[in-house]
Curated annotation (Swiss-Prot):
Residues of the site described as Cleavage: D61, S62
Motif BH2 location, chain numbering: 180-195
Gene3D superfamilies reported for this sequence: Blc2-like
Protein name: Bcl-2-like protein 1
Amino acid sequence: MSQSNRELVVDFLSYKLSQKGYSWSQFSDVEENRTEAPEGTESEMETPSAINGNPSWHLADSPAVNGATGHSSSLDAREVIPMAAVKQALREAGDEFELRYRRAFSDLTSQLHITPGTAYQSFEQVVNELFRDGVNWGRIVAFFSFGGALCVESVDKEMQVLVSRIAAWMATYLNDHLEPWIQENGGWDTFVELYGNNAAAESRKGQERFNRWFLTGMTVAGVVLLGSLFSRK
């Protein structure tokens, strides 16, 4: 699963960089040996501790937060959703999340004070806070959006070397700490079922399903994420 998770990370970061006029190919070969794992081998992917600092990830004991429960039963008889659909759903959900918190994301520069020496610490602290009370799909979207914003900020500040590092940190965290919850809650198929086909934006417009899952996922994630950003000095 490590390669497919990394593929999701790279696709999302590529998309976010392209929105700002940057190309992933400009940065993908920078310190490539730090982020690329030989195909089919998760254990050989370099961990964040070997890049910049020691990880101290912590998650709540219970994975069910804010109404996030398993959906696997509704998907038992369904074919596996193509990776392309997962990528598209992540892109759309990320866009919707950032639209709702546009002002806060535009303030990342002054809040994080990124440098090559402190980027990992900033990433670690925000992600720890984001998942402190557990995992849900909205917080996973926030996780991807934060990583994308961090990459764009790094490039804007001419610290392109951080892009490949951030991709590695995200892939490692996704594999080690989010993958178990994802599998217990129906896998990425469930994510596409909830967030695919621009569901977040459509729900916001129609309000029919918006209060049921978006407010208990994305909005809570936004509050947690932005709270962790703005509490930093």
